[in-house]
Swiss-Prot record:
<feature type="transmembrane region" description="Helical; Name=6">
    <location>
        <begin position="264"/>
        <end position="283"/>
    </location>
</feature>
<feature type="transmembrane region" description="Helical; Name=5">
    <location>
        <begin position="204"/>
        <end position="224"/>
    </location>
</feature>
<comment type="subunit">
    <text>Interacts with VDAC1.</text>
</comment>
<keyword id="KW-0496">Mitochondrion</keyword>
<keyword id="KW-0813">Transport</keyword>
<dbReference type="GO" id="GO:0005743">
    <property type="term" value="C:mitochondrial inner membrane"/>
</dbReference>
<dbReference type="GO" id="GO:0005739">
    <property type="term" value="C:mitochondrion"/>
</dbReference>
<feature type="transmembrane region" description="Helical; Name=2">
    <location>
        <begin position="71"/>
        <end position="89"/>
    </location>
</feature>
<keyword id="KW-0812">Transmembrane</keyword>
<feature type="transmembrane region" description="Helical; Name=4">
    <location>
        <begin position="164"/>
        <end position="183"/>
    </location>
</feature>
<comment type="similarity">
    <text>Belongs to the mitochondrial carrier (TC 2.A.29) family.</text>
</comment>
<feature type="transmembrane region" description="Helical; Name=3">
    <location>
        <begin position="106"/>
        <end position="124"/>
    </location>
</feature>
<dbReference type="Pfam" id="PF00153">
    <property type="entry name" value="Mito_carr"/>
</dbReference>
<dbReference type="InterPro" id="IPR002067">
    <property type="entry name" value="Mit_carrier"/>
</dbReference>
<protein>
    <recommendedName>
        <fullName>Kidney mitochondrial carrier protein 1</fullName>
    </recommendedName>
</protein>
<feature type="modified residue" description="N-acetylserine">
    <location>
        <position position="2"/>
    </location>
</feature>
<comment type="function">
    <text>Antiporter that transports inorganic anions (sulfate, sulfite, thiosulfate and phosphate) and, to a lesser extent, a variety of dicarboxylates (e.g. malonate, malate and citramalate) and, even more so, aspartate. The sulfate/sulfate exchange is much higher than the phosphate/phosphate and malate/malate exchanges. The transport affinities is higher for sulfate and thiosulfate than for any other substrate. May catalyze the export of sulfite and thiosulfate (the hydrogen sulfide degradation products) from the mitochondria, thereby modulating the level of the hydrogen sulfide.</text>
</comment>
Length: 291
């Protein structure tokens, strides 16, 4: 068995941070779209945004362009932990399963993707909670990352920082279990078929495909996860809106219809698409460094 390779961990973290910075305003509109229209939360009952472009324009006009990067600090911190662990663990698990990349199968890649997604997302969950809380707030009433962290910890305790961890792990299992294997398999078949070489164009097409498939598979879980993380706990520890993840899913479907589970799909895909393209193009170039 070969020694643990550090490069996928470092390259994965760097590429993840680069992709996050490039697509963060789209992610912010996705969060705002997903939390609006909740009949059981007066703070988010109003439908303020008609779609992604309207949200971008209204937030920029009313809160300033800086508001489009509300929550970027915990988002970068999240990618430094989540992205690093996710890619490093995925690549390491694959090499434990099979020695050569040519011998990888879809099943092996999916299992490795699911495991790496669950592990990395569970560890990085507090940064995810911070990011969503900061994105949901109007920038006029928003404090910094440390203030937000202390506010959650003081009012909700340690449990507040791991709120929605099961949903986050489920979403990560779906996203990572779909996106990374789809990228690897698409890239492998394009190269082995002779249609394309190991080029930037191949990386672009493979990453675009995995972003679309990942968005379709993960959006319902993402909506529920976002709402669960955004709701505040009462002083007695109870939650004001949803009793749990299943209750959130059923209430959302019942009160707003099935397609409410696909709220924010376009910004979700338009984020996952460019995010994956930036990530994989950066990652593939970093792999070529002679270190």
């Amino acid at each position: 068995m070969s020694a643990l390779n550090w490069k996928p961990f470092v390259y994965g973290g760097l590429a993840s941070i680069t992709a996050e910075c490039g697509t963060f305003p789209i992610d912010l509109t996705k969060t705002r779209l997903q939390i609006q229209g909740q009949t059981n939360d007066a703070n988010f009952r109003e439908i303020r945004y008609r779609g992604m472009l309207h949200a971008l324009m209204r937030i920029g006009r009313e809160e300033g362009l800086k508001a489009l990067y509300s929550g970027i600090a915990p988002a970068m911190l999240r990618q430094a932990s989540y992205g690093t662990i996710k890619i490093g663990t995925y690549q390491s698990l694959k090499r434990l399963a099979v020695e050569r990349p040519e011998d990888e199968t879809l099943l092996v890649n999916v299992v490795c993707g699911i495991l790496s997604g669950v592990i990395s997302s569970a560890i990085a969950n507090p940064t995810d909670v911070l990011k969503i809380r900061m994105q949901a707030q109007n920038s006029a009433v928003q404090g910094g990352m440390i203030d937000s962290f202390m506010s959650i910890y003081q009012q909700e305790g340690t449990r507040g920082l791991w709120k929605g961890v099961s949903l986050t792990a489920q979403r990560a299992a779906i996203v990572v279990g779909v996106e990374l294997p789809v990228y690897d398999i698409t890239k492998k078949h394009l190269i082995l078929s002779g249609l394309m070489g190991d080029t930037v164009a191949t990386h672009f097409l493979s990453s675009f495909t995995c972003g679309l498939v990942g968005a379709l598979a993960s959006n319902p879980v993402d909506v529920v996860r976002t709402r669960m993380m955004n709701q505040r706990a009462l002083r007695d520890g109870r939650c004001a809106g949803y009793k749990g993840t299943l209750d959130c899913l059923l209430q959302t479907w019942k009160n707003e219809g099935f397609f409410a589970l696909y709220k924010g799909f376009w910004p979700n895909w338009l984020r996952l698409g460019p995010w994956n393209i930036i990530f994989f193009l950066t990652y593939e170039q970093l792999k070529k460094l002679d270190l």
